[in-house]
A protein has these predicted regions:
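Short beta-strand to alpha-helix junction loop
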Residues: 92-113, 168, 233-238
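N-terminal FAD cofactor-binding segment of flavoenzymes
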Residues: 43-81
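Glycine-rich FAD pyrophosphate-binding loop
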Residues: 24-44
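Predominantly flavin-linked oxidoreductase catalytic cores and closely associated redox partners
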Residues: 114-254
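Conserved Rossmann-like nucleotide-cofactor binding loop
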Residues: 15, 38, 166
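Beta1/beta-strand and adjacent pyrophosphate-binding region of the FAD-binding site
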Residues: 2-15
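FAD/FMN-dependent oxidoreductases across multiple families
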Residues: 235-292
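Helix-loop-beta segment of a Rossmann-like dinucleotide-binding subdomain
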Residues: 84-102, 141, 225-229
Length: 292
């Protein structure tokens, strides 16, 4: 089966769904595909800064984020080793008087639903297996396998890869890395219930960081991060050991509060990848978000 579009976007998370939404609102015929089921979580931090909240307001989606129960953030506290904490109030500006950190299964769903309302054809549980090309070699869409196992060709004038750091679109289009970083951070995080937080809280220690991110359903995300080598060494004694050791060493004041809170999820981990920039466009294709 073959269907034609102006644009097909691969990846229906924040970057891809937003791209599809804006293109559809501008009048383009857009298909949006993602291999994951609709409304699922993904490995991610999700603390939005003012620019992100402003965009949601401009797109008419901020009220839905607020209605989802995401905690309003009106203060950020910075904790430093051997120093007093620094509190910064979030000033009202541009129609935004608070920041928000909605869970990804909440935020992604809100943006995807808005894209559908704008006319985007969304296909979840659709795995991209190949890029299509015309007789000149220009990228001309994607071939996907849908949830029923059927192969479907989605032909498009432009194919947008929004499929993350391991982008299949980037690899198959022949995108090359133009700049490569040398540093990386390994992260562990978990959600806690009934954990009092004044807003965003960031703590900085020796080659490590930690923090609190209030989110939906009265929960707070707690993360720790350090170099990949240090994280690997600590995890030899177990992931829980690594999490608690880093939290106590980096942010003892935060660790005291975590000790009396109730875990609301398992630990999630990210091994760390050095940052990079890829060539973000070519004949018939472009990259957005982490893909580029």
């Amino acid at each position: 089966m073959t269907t034609g579009y102006d644009v097909v976007v691969v990846g229906a998370r924040v970057a891809g769904a937003s791209t599809a939404l804006l293109l559809a609102r501008a009048g383009a015929r857009v298909a949006l595909v993602d291999r994951a089921p609709y409304g699922t979580d993904t490995l991610s931090t999700h603390a939005l800064m003012r620019a992100g909240v402003l965009q949601l307001r401009r797109w008419g989606l901020l009220d839905e984020v607020i209605a989802s129960g995401a905690s309003p953030i009106r203060r950020t506290t910075f904790h430093y080793a051997d120093s007093k904490s620094l509190e910064v109030a979030i000033r009202a500006d541009g129609g935004v008087d608070a920041l928000y950190a909605p869970r990804r299964q909440v935020l992604d769903r809100i943006i995807v639903d808005a894209a559908v309302a704008a006319g985007v054809e969304v296909r979840h549980e659709a795995l991209v297996t190949a890029l299509l090309r015309d007789n000149t070699g220009r990228v001309a869409g994607v071939r996907v396998t849908d949830r029923a196992g059927r192969a479907v060709d989605l032909r498009a004038t432009v194919t947008v890869g929004a499929d993350g750091i391991r982008s299949a679109v980037a690899d198959n289009a022949g995108s090359t890395v133009t700049r490569q970083g040398r540093s990386a951070s390994a992260i562990l995080y978990r959600y806690y219930a009934e954990l009092p937080a004044t807003g965003y809280e960031w703590a900085y220690g020796h080659s490590a960081a930690a923090g609190f991110i209030p989110t939906n359903e009265g929960c707070t995300g707690v993360f720790v991060g350090t170099t990949p080598a240090r994280m690997r060494a600590l995890r030899r004694d177990g992931t829980e050991h690594a999490f608690q050791t880093l939290l106590a060493a980096t942010a003892p004041r935060l660790a005291e509060r975590v000790a009396v809170a109730a875990p609301a999820s398992r630990l999630h981990g990210w091994a760390g990848v050095a940052g990079f920039l890829r060539r973000p466009y070519g004949p018939g294709w472009a990259l957005v978000g982490d893909a580029g």
